Each structure stands twice: as C-alpha cells, then as structure tokens.
C-alpha cells in the first residue's frame, strides 16, 4: 500500500514515522521519516500510495542518531527559491507563469488566467508566481493556488478542488472567529509616488457602523487603472468578513492522501460545519498502519 523508493529500492521496511504536510502559507510539501538507511543530502526519494507516486522530492535535511537517521525531503518547489530577472509586457497571467517556468526547465499545467501582467521582476521564482496569482485574484475575484505534482507545477482554481475522502472524525471541535484581518473600506491608489490620485473607493457602511473603520490601501500601476473598480470590489469581498477556523483530527479510511492544503472538503459535524470548507493546512502521520490527519479549515 505504501512505499518509499530510493534508487529503485523500497526502503519502507527499514523506515518508520513517516509524516507529510502542506500549508497554504508555505512553499511546497515536505515529508519527514526515520530510517536505518544512510542517505545523503540531495538524494531523490519517492513516496507511493497504492502504487501511485504521491510525492517526489529532495533530501534537504538529515540528522544522525546512534542507530538511525531522520530525514526531511521537500518537493521540487525547493528550486523556486532561485532569484531571477523577468519582464512581462501585456501577457496574460497563465502564459506569464508558463513562460517563466519554461525558461528554467520546469514543466507546468496552468489553468487559463486572463489577467494581463505588465511588470519587471527581480526576485525569486516563487515570489513572482505569488505576485501574478495575487494580481489575478484581485482582478478576477477567483482564488488560484499553486502546488507541485511530482515534477510539474500545477496552478488551479480552488473552487474546482473538491475532495471526498472516507474518514472518521475525531472528538468535538472548537470554532474560532476573528476580525483581525477584516477590511470594510478599500482604496485603490497609484503606485507612483508623484501621483496622489485615488482610482477607486468602495466601502461597506453597515460594517463600518458595526466594527468601526478598517481600511486597506492597494497600489496599482497607471496602466492598470481601468481595473481599479473591479480590484476594489474583489478586495472588499475577500476581506469584509470575520474569518472562521477550526482544527480537526481525522483517521483516514480511504483516499485520505487526497487531503492537502488548497482543497475543499465537506465535513458535516452536528450544527458546526456544513458545506464545503477550505483546507488551510494538512498534517499526515503514518505509523503502525494507521493514517492520521490533522487539518485546519478556514472559511
């Protein structure tokens, strides 16, 4: 059912305490495990579930004890930390990401993203892609995300990522609600220091009366001025609410490996959870033939 492959050999029998995690706020997926096998940093390992390759990555950290080794492996997004120079002139976002990755020999599967990108970048590959997706989300009002699928970067729409694993839900849950990130007024201004123009303003008067003024200022370039009102509307929709979250322990029965960050899952728990909620983070542990998952939901 599970295999850990190094140089064509299954080393699972000599390995234990396998865990893996993904989070919307981190660069990629990481796998940690203990093993009697001595691997070197930079070695490539694969993790297979039901004969399907689920993870491929590089050993980036190693610690040695008296009788065994502990390893941390990261998927190929490890290389997205490379800093580059790239200019885009009126190219749609999906084509911009494809062009960037192709230049550095990285294969990709990118959903169509029509937002136009006009910008010069001097930063990491990851930061460039994050900025492009941020522009697209503000322009389209659609949540996009990226992740590595073996050796291919995939960019998809969150709304398309519904999963239905079979799990046993743990004990009662606690739901937290926060207005720390709430914004009920949005100003779109010029990114040029000499230009003090306000391109668009949108606010929720009812929420301002209830919570007080919580304002966000977003800067855009002059050439994107026509999108200002649309960006303001989408930002208000994104920020003008209390954020709810909860952490849940699950025992995986079937297809638990599909549980990862940037998925929508439906867990009906009494009157506390109904409908499809976003997985912000997922932490898996595989020990003694039990697959346990702790997830953080956010909505």
What are these regions, as identified by a protein language model?
Residues 22-35, 67-78, 188, 241-252, ...:
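Oligomerization/assembly interface segments of phage tail-like spikes and tubes
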Residues 1-5, 34-64, 92-103, 256-282:
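Short, acidic/charged, Gly/Pro-enriched secondary-structure junctions
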Residues 53-58, 70, 85, 199, ...:
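Well-ordered beta-strand positions in beta-sheet-rich domains
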Residues 104, 133-136, 140, 190, ...:
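Sec/Tat-exported extracytoplasmic proteins
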